[in-house]
Amino acid sequence: MKKVVVGLSGGVDSSTAAAILHHQGYEVIGLTLWLMKGKGQCCSEGMIDAADLCEQLGVPHQIVDIRDLFQTHIVDYLVTGYSAGITPLPCSQCNKTVKFGPMVQYAREELGCDRIATGHYARISYDEATGRYQLLRAIDRNKDQSYFLYDLSQDLLAATIFPLGELEKTDTRRIATEYGLKTADKPESQDLCLVESNGSMRAFLDKYLAPKSGDIVDTTGKILGQHDGVHHYTIGQRKGLGIAAAEPLYVIELDAENNKVVVGDRTKVTQPECTVNRVNWVSIAEPSTPIHAEVQIRYRSTPTPVTVIPLENSRVRLVFDEPQFSITPGQAAVWYDGEKVLGGGIIEQFS
C-alpha cells in the first residue's frame, strides 16, 4: 500500500485531501505542524479538528512542534522586514521553509515515507522532455494558490501530491459532505494565520515594534503630517494617512533610515519595471536570454505581460508592457506561461 503523509490544519481543504487519498487506498498518516507560540487559538482548534478527522478516518495523527522554526523564518522575518520599510510576504516563505521542507524531511526520516500531500489548490505535472516537475495553476482559478508555491524546489515538488488541484471549491465541500467529514461546513480562514490570531497585522506588529513617530512628507520634503511608525504603512497605501490634500496622495516610499513616510500622486507610485531577487525557476531551467511571460505582482492581481531579463545572483529584471501601480518591495512577483509557473522571487526596494 502506498504511504503518504498529509499535512492537516483542521480545515475543510486539508481534511478532504486526506479523505480522498484514504479512499483511494493510500496509507494516510495525518501530520499537524504546531506553528505559533502563546495562545494561538487557530492552532489549538486546528489540532483538535485534525485529530478528530484522523480518528474518523481511522488513521494515525502526529503533531510536530516547529514553533522555533516558525518564529525564526516567519515572525522574525516579518518584523525585520516591516521595520526596514518593506512589506514581506510570509506565505511563500512559510510554504518552503516551515511547511513543505520540514514535512518532507520528517516523512522521510521519521516515518519512512517519500510522499506528502496538502490541501493547496495547485497542480503538479512531470515534463519528460525536460526532466522537470512543473507547477500549474489549479482548475479553480479563484482558489488557485500557485502564486504562494513558486519557491518550492524540484525535490519538494517531486514529493508532493495536491489532491484538490483538479477540483472546484464547491466540489471539495460536496466531497467532504459525502464522506461525512465534520469540517465540511467549517468556515474558511480569511487572512494570514498571524493576523487571525492577533486581530490585525497592526496588532501583531505592535507586539514587537514600539511606536516611533516621524514625518509624512511630500516629494519636496514638505511636512504634511505625522506617523507613528513606518511599519504601519505600505507602498501604494492611500487610506489611513490622516492628511488632507487637494488630490489623492499615496505612499510612494518608506524611508526607514530617516523614519519618514513619503507620499505623492498616483504617477509617483507607478513603475515601468522592477528588480526581483531570491528567484526560483520552477517549471523551466533558468534561461540565458530574456523571455516573455505574464506576471502577478500580488496574489489577486491580474496577470500582465512582462519581459523577464535574467541577471546574476538569482535576480531578474521585470520590464512591464504597461507601467504597474503599487509595486511593493517584499512581495512576490510570479511569472507564468499560461497555467504554468515559470518562476518567481521577491521584489527589491527601489533605489
Swiss-Prot record:
Entries under InterPro entries matching the protein: MnmA-like, MnmA-like_C, MnmA-like_central, MnmA-like_central_sf, Rossmann-like_a/b/a_fold
Catalytic machinery residues: 94 (nucleophile), 193 (cysteine persulfide intermediate)
CC terms in the record's Gene Ontology section: cytoplasm
Region (Interaction with tRNA): 143-145, 298-299
Entries under Gene3D superfamilies matching the protein: Adenine nucleotide alpha hydrolases-like domains, HUPs, Translation factors
EC number: 2.8.1.13
SUPFAM superfamilies: Adenine nucleotide alpha hydrolases-like
Gene Ontology molecular functions: ATP binding; tRNA binding; tRNA-uridine 2-sulfurtransferase activity
Residues the record marks as site: Interaction with tRNA: 120, 331
One of the GO biological process terms: tRNA wobble position uridine thiolation
Gene: mnmA
Family listed: Belongs to the MnmA/TRMU family.
Compartment(s): Cytoplasm
PANTHER family: MITOCHONDRIAL TRNA-SPECIFIC 2-THIOURIDYLASE 1, TRNA 5-METHYLAMINOMETHYL-2-THIOURIDYLATE -METHYLTRANSFERASE
Protein's UniProt name: tRNA-specific 2-thiouridylase MnmA
